[in-house]
Amino acid sequence: MADGDKAAIQFFRGTDEPVVPDIRLTRSRDGRTGQATFIFEQPEALAPETLGNIAGMWMVDEEGELVTREVNGKFVNGKPSALEATYTWKTEQDFERFMRFAERYAETKGLGYSNNSGNNEGADEASEG
C-alpha cells in the first residue's frame, strides 16, 4: 500500500490484491457481534505464478491493519477459482473500526454500498447514507 490515505486487502503481506471482493455483513440483533464475508472470484492470490501459502487476509489502512485467518479456497474441476474470507468482530468498537476500513477501501476502489434485496432476518446490510 503506497499512499497513507488508501486502504488495501492483502493475502501476502506487502502485496495488494487487485480483485475487488463481494462483501456481505451480518450482525447480531444487539449489534455487538457480527461478520463480514469477503468473496474474491479469480483473485491474483490464486494465480499459478503466485508463490507461497495464504496464511490470512490483511485489511490495511492508515490506522493499521485488521487480520483474519479464516480464509478458504474454492475449487472447480480441481482448479482454484475463488477465495472466501470471514472477518468476525465481537465489540461495537471492532465493528466501527471495520466500517472505517470499509469506507476507506470503498473510496480507494471507487465503490459504494447497496442494500441486499433478499430477506436476511436478523442481518444488517451496509447502506448508503
Swiss-Prot record:
Where does the record place the region Disordered?
A: 110-129
Of which family is this protein a member? Belongs to the Psb28 family.
Q: Where is the signal peptide?
A: none
Name of the protein described by the UniProt record: Photosystem II reaction center Psb28 protein
Q: Give the organism, scientific name.
A: Synechococcus sp. (strain WH7803)
Q: What is the lineage of its organism?
A: Bacteria, Bacillati, Cyanobacteriota, Cyanophyceae, Synechococcales
Report any one BP term from Gene Ontology. Answer: photosynthesis
Which InterPro entries does the record match to this protein? Answer: Psb28_c1_sf (IPR038676), PSII_Psb28_class-1 (IPR005610)
Top-level lineage group:
Bacteria
Pfam families per the record?
Psb28
GO cellular component labels: photosystem II oxygen evolving complex; plasma membrane-derived thylakoid membrane
What does the record say about its membrane topology?
Peripheral membrane protein
| Record localization | Cellular thylakoid membrane
Keyword annotations for this protein, in alphabetical order, are: Membrane, Photosynthesis, Photosystem II, Thylakoid
What is the annotated quaternary arrangement, including any partners? Part of the photosystem II complex.
